[in-house]
Amino acid sequence: MRNRFLSLSILALLALTGCGAGDPAIAVDGSEGPLVIYPDYKDVTIPANIAPLNFRYAMPDVRKAKTTFTLGDKSVTIRGDEVEWRLGAWKKFLEGAEGQSITVTAKAVVEGKPLTDQWSIQVSEDPVDGWLTYRLIEPSYQMYHEVSILERCVENFDETAICDWQHTDNACMNCHVHGQSRGDYSLYYIRGPQGGSILNQNGKLRKLSLKTDGMLSATVYGELHPDGRFGVFSTNVILPSFHAEAVARMEVFDSASDLTVADFENNRMINVPHVARADAWETFPCFSADGRAVFYCVADTVSLPDGLMEAKYDLVRADFDPETGIIGEQVDTVWSGRTHNASVCHPKASPDGRWLMFTVSDYGTFPLFHPECTLYLADLQSGEIRPMDEIKGNKSDSYHSWSSNSRWFVFASKRGDGQYGKPYFCHLDSDGRTTKPFVLPQKSARFYLYNLKSFNVPDLGNASTGMTVRDARRMFEAESEIFQ
């Protein structure tokens, strides 16, 4: 059988290949219509507390552009091919706009031809959580240095570093997650010899060593329990590989993985022997909204790397005892990857307990470069599960998180160029209907044209974490609390 994958040592010779540069004035994933804009904010639904939707006309030789926004008896006109609002003017314009529609009328001369376009922007009655954390990282194979975890206020353009490479001796860091979308309850990792799990509980920071001698590795993926005492995690032996053919570029897969529970009150790890099967891989656990169940992904082991495309992860559920931290022995299948010839990762329960969102790709658990990767939505009341095809991009849609009101979610997507992940927001109503996703607004209309880093693991919070890089340095230099 022909080996589908190349080793890292061989691929080092291929790292110098590049891609041709196209016309920077033309957006790969710009809007439709007579006048192409990027980012595409045509016919989207937004929360009233979002930052200004700044955009540019992504066409060559744009002249005499005039864009008029109308909301009731209010009207604002911006001239030029880059439409950038002053923050105060945008906020004033949106005062009392909840439940109403903005009409945008655009006129411009493009390559000597006068064009007119019109679209609407619906303002939702539901606000979105005001803070978004993400890791900024090069979309490459070996670049883990010069990494940072940032917190952005989505109501304006303020961005603060929570942790960065300059304050951690160029250590790798990853996976900042909020517990129940709370700003004062979160966790992230600093990797390496001086690393640890940085737990934020009500503003108090702790550096934890979530690893015992009997575990495969330190904790990798996981989530914090709503009550604050426990966390559920996977321990993974992770290997990278590369496709010899132009299919999905990079792969990351587990050669071994188990589940474990961390007791933050008693500094102990709780093994789950009845779940940690020798003939299966378990990963990506999360809690139900009430904290009484754990959802996770599990697959039968296969021979690696040749058998990776046969790794089909199921989505399963088990009870969780919030008094003891014990995961129940009965495991029920929520969605079978094997039956659907597909694979599940990244399950996330909505805070109101109604929905469970997860990611589906053809195989494995690293869908970042899988263009087929799609978000699925499970209604935990009715049992209905469906692919969210209506919001699917032309490239992978992967990691996602919920706003605390369960009416908005954000997800990472490589739609467009296929290289750089960006955070997209989407509204979900009480019946599970979605609206057209829109990308995180930026102060400069040309930001995404020149940005060369991926937004990785976008996670919403209802308040600021309050953490800074000085805190990261202090934690980096601190001794880790040992877990038994």
What are the roles of these predicted feature ranges?
Residues 1-5:
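Positively charged n-region of N-terminal signal peptides that target proteins for export
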Residues 7-17:
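Bacterial N-terminal signal peptides
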Residues 19-484:
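Sequence signature of WD/YWTD-type beta-propeller architectures
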